[in-house]
Amino acid sequence: MALPIPKKNKAVPFLFAGSFASGKQRTTRSRTRVRGTVEAGFPSPAEEELVDTLSLDELLIQNREASFLLRVTGDSMTGAGIMPKDLVIVDRGRTAKSGDIVIAEVDGQWTMKYLRKRGENVTLVAANPRYQPIRPKHELKIAGVVTAVVRKYT
């Protein structure tokens, strides 16, 4: 299945490139220092040392030219750890397969859901049991596959 590219979406060349919705872009890159590891289970002695540096763009975006950001509204994907106000990174160059979280236009409405395929039947499934599965009546266009979620805690 070919992934149509929505006309209003533009590739954002850098992960933190400003507001996708407003079209503003800031094209600075930075590398963040990796200072070691932290135990998320039982406490361990703390040691800090410079281990490496990394670019969040390189870590989170595999296909820069085909990727863009969307800000999440609604709570249908909270069971997948995607919360309102999160940013999702979408790769419109990936072929969507069953089980992927996709951005889809279904019967004229945009949504983010799990893609489920069984033979010729396609269903979009929320990660929140309060929402019913969506079975396209007329048309389904997959705009891209969600590849990462970005959340700011403060």
List the predicted regions and their residue ranges.
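Short, hydrophobic/aromatic-rich segments at coil-to-beta transitions
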Residues: 67, 97-102, 123
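Short, conserved secondary-structure segments in the cores of folded domains
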Residues: 68, 78-79, 86, 92
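Hydrophobic beta-strand signal
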Residues: 89-90, 103
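PDZ-domain C-terminal substructure recognizer with occasional recognition of PDZ-binding tails
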Residues: 106, 111-135
